[in-house]
Amino acid sequence: MDLRQFLMCLSLCTAFALSKPTEKKDRVHHEPQLSDKVHNDAQNFDYDHDAFLGAEEAKSFGQLTPEESKEKLGMIVDKIDTDKDGFVTEGELKSRIKHAQKKYIYDNVENQWQEFDMNQDGLISWDEYRNVTYGTYLDDPDPDDGFNYKPIMVRDERRFKMADQDGDLIATKEEFTAFLHPEEYDYMKDIVLQETMEDIDQNADGFIDLEEYIGDMYSHDGNADEPQWVKTEREQFVEFRDKNRDGKMDKEETKDWILPSDYDHAEAEARHLVYESDQDKDGKLTKEEIVDKYDLFVGSQATDFGEALVRHDEF
């Protein structure tokens, strides 16, 4: 399926989805959870393992002996200590946890990288991305299906330029990640806001009124009554979204809606790990302090064996 067919299919699917009276579109960007486990260190350290390693890598540590687990953890600590001062700070731990938290994003970028890096130089230029994505349209700007791809391409180019911090129109892997997942980067949040405003602000007055807000997430189906969640969203708009009560959301109000300041779970977990492992209470961790508490950070066959006994007893 070429790009035109894909986008037309996507448009039809979107239209079909929006026609369902009870289906809701959610534009709010939330941080992914650190783990789906309960955080209860009195029972086990599964939550901490997922937060520190990521859920998939945490499973692999359950197959290691304690000695193997400690050795592998030591190698991870060397990578976390980015300034190579022999200590792991709360900030360095937070960065590690954030990376594990967003592993699915990095995996998504890796899966797409080879498709766009046409000359295999480890970078993706705007020309490479445009040619792969819009090559068919560039060859035939007036397609038979009548679909106009130019606005989409212009929007992509604007976002690419925003992600490209040094302005050379060539994206590193980190810049390409920011292009594909702008909501994850502080310096890209303005473009997320701009694109959202363009999508919802139908009369282009620079604001989102109540009907535009509801219309973006709900398509009214003839004479059918509005579902309860739509009535709730109307109340949310009046009571919470429209903070200055002028009947519409400006850019700041819209930004607060789609990019809320969530509780920072990664920071809280980093603080917890330091508190539990910092034997000399100097506010930072040595490699030895971390490895001594390997069961908290990563676990092993031994720690999982204890949990397995509990699970066996439950059966």
Swiss-Prot record:
Positions contributing to Ca(2+) 4 binding: D201, N203, D205, E212
Motif (Prevents secretion from ER): 312-315
Disulfide bonds: none
Binding site for Ca(2+) 2: D117, N119, D121, E128
Modified residues (Phosphothreonine): T65, T254
Signal peptide location: 1-19
Binding site for Ca(2+) 1: D81, D83, D85, E92
In-chain residues carrying the UniProt-annotated modification Phosphoserine: S69, S261, S277
SUPFAM superfamilies: EF-hand
SMART domains attached to this UniProt entry: EFh
One Pfam family linked to the record: EF-hand_8
Binding site for Ca(2+) 5: D242, N244, D246, K248, E253
Quaternary context: Binds crotoxin. Interacts with GGCX.
Record-given protein name: Calumenin
Organism, scientific name: Rattus norvegicus (Rat)
Lineage of the species this protein comes from: Eukaryota, Metazoa, Chordata, Craniata, Vertebrata
